[in-house]
Swiss-Prot record:
Protein name: Mannan endo-1,4-beta-mannosidase
Lineage: Bacteria, Pseudomonadati, Pseudomonadota, Gammaproteobacteria, Cellvibrionales
Catalytic residue list: E173 (proton donor), E269 (nucleophile)
Organism: Cellvibrio japonicus (strain Ueda107)
Domain CBM10 stretches: 357-390, 395-424
Catalyzed reaction equations: Random hydrolysis of (1->4)-beta-D-mannosidic linkages in mannans, galactomannans and glucomannans
Gene this protein is translated from: man5A
Job description of the protein: Catalyzes the endo hydrolysis of beta-1,4-linked mannan, galactomannan and glucomannan. It is able to hydrolyze mannosidic linkages that are flanked by mannose or glucose.
Positions of disulphide bridges: none
């Protein structure tokens, strides 16, 4: 018996047709997988804000350091659109917006939230949204964190898809004094899990205990545990610095702890005065710049008469800066001198003395901050990537903060390319 069966013409045609169909199916499958891969690549290239170590990053991987102002929308909704334009004009890259879930004030409807986000985007501002009704829960009548989550889920259509532009601050100062660490931790953990299960992939911001000031260090001591409990590891921590932080020692002790833990911190509220007590706002801004942490000054305007010193401008008039507003915006470490617009708006991205950014060369690579041309051909290696060694100095390390060298100013300080710069001679003389 023959070991091989000869192929008839019919068998050959059948085999050929089967092979042809098989090949077409393979090609279709490959094309489908390729298209899926391209879609996934597009999504991953711009998947919203995320946390890497102590840094908040845009979807494209650029660091984003908040420099902005709080805006009391829930109490003055008719002022919001103009205020957003005025806040953006200060150079701010972000705005924290007061909303209400209806527990204490008029509920902010989903349509208003969508409009706020749209207006902020038009002004190149990243929006931090917060429910203010949770303020001081446990020590005064207030909404619970669970009620705040109910609100976020109810307005989810305004939020889903805005992950590149919106950060959700779950609840403002959601615990007063006298609350246990386990209460702060467990209720925040529950809130985060509910939001994740509801489809929210946004960066979530959580406020400290003790009316946000964390004088018992409840948030500081439990931040790592809460961060690791989030399945997305996409949480940033917000402390409100008022009279508990009257000097640089208090400010630095708190910020350096988060820096050592490699966890992201934002000063979600602060001012230079609180109910007549001094707050070391200068140190808050300087230390935030040193460590690469964000800050958001309280608040644009509209504070009650006993807190009018906390207004950045008088009566929502952008041309009338208060003493506090001038400090927040024009200080060496203030908004105008340190803010960088988000790159999703075409900005250059954020930098600080710790972020290691000294500008971008024409070829798209960063300029080296410290490397020499030891590797040859004008290239260096910093922050685990190649950098361009400038042929002439382009930046100055001014007492721990990096500033660009002015092109047209021969001495002192100048203003070029919409930011402060320092003359080479002044830098050399420090």
């Amino acid at each position: 018996m023959s070991l091989f069966t000869p192929l008839s013409e019919t068998n050959v045609r059948s085999h050929t047709n089967t092979s042809s169909v098989f090949c077409r199916r393979i090609k279709t499958l490959v094309a489908g997988l390729t298209a899926l891969g391209l879609m996934l690549a597009a999504v991953s290239a711009s998947a919203g804000f995320y946390v890497s170590g102590k840094q908040l990053r845009e979807g494209n991987g650029n660091n984003f350091i908040m420099r902005g102002v709080n805006l009391p929308h829930a109490w003055f909704p008719d002022r919001t659109n103009q205020a957003l334009a005025d806040i953006s004009a200060t150079g701010a890259n972000s705005v924290r917006v007061v909303l209400s879930n209806g527990r204490l004030w008029s509920r902010t409807p989903e349509s208003q939230v969508a409009s706020i986000i749209s207006q902020a985007k038009a002004r190149q501002l990243i929006t931090v949204l917060e429910v203010h009704d949770t303020t001081g829960y446990g020590e005064q009548t207030a909404a619970t964190l669970s009620e705040a989550v109910d609100y976020w889920i109810a307005i989810r259509n305004a939020l889903i898809g805005q992950e590149d532009y919106v950060i959700i601050n779950i609840g403002n100062e959601p615990f007063g004094n006298g609350q246990s660490a386990s209460t702060w931790l467990n209720l925040h953990r529950d809130a985060i899990n509910r939001l994740r299960n509801a489809g929210f992939t946004h960066t979530l911001m959580v406020d400290a205990a003790n009316w946000g000031q964390d004088w018992e260090n409840i948030m500081r001591n439990n931040a790592s545990s809460l961060f690791n409990s989030d399945p997305r590891r996409n949480v940033i921590f917000s402390v409100h610095m008022y009279e508990v932080y009257p000097n640089d020692t208090a400010v630095n002790n708190y910020m350096s702890a988060f820096n050592s833990m490699n966890l992201p911190l934002v000063v979600g509220e602060f001012a230079a005065n609180h109910f007549g007590s001094y707050v070391d706002a200068g140190s808050i801004m300087a230390r935030a710049q040193q460590y690469g942490f964000g800050y958001l000054g309280w608040s644009w305007s509209g504070n009650s008469s006993n807190l009018s010193a906390l207004d950045v401008v008088t009566n929502f008039n952008a041309g009338s800066l208060t003493t506090w507003g001038n400090l927040l915006i024009n200080n060496t470490n203030g908004i105008r001198n340190t803010s960088r617009k988000a790159t999703i708006f075409g900005g250059s991205g954020s930098s600080s003395s710790s972020a290691g950014s000294c500008g971008t060369a024409p070829n798209g690579y960063p300029y080296c901050c410290n490397a020499s041309s030891a590797t040859g051909n004008g290239w260096g290696w910093e922050n685990n990537r190649s950098c361009v060694v400038a042929t002439t100095s382009t930046s100055c390390n001014w007492y721990g903060t990096s500033y660009p060298i002015c092109v047209n100013t021969s001495s002192g300080w100048g203003w070029e390319n919409n930011r402060s710069c320092i003359a080479a001679s002044t830098c050399a003389a420090q």
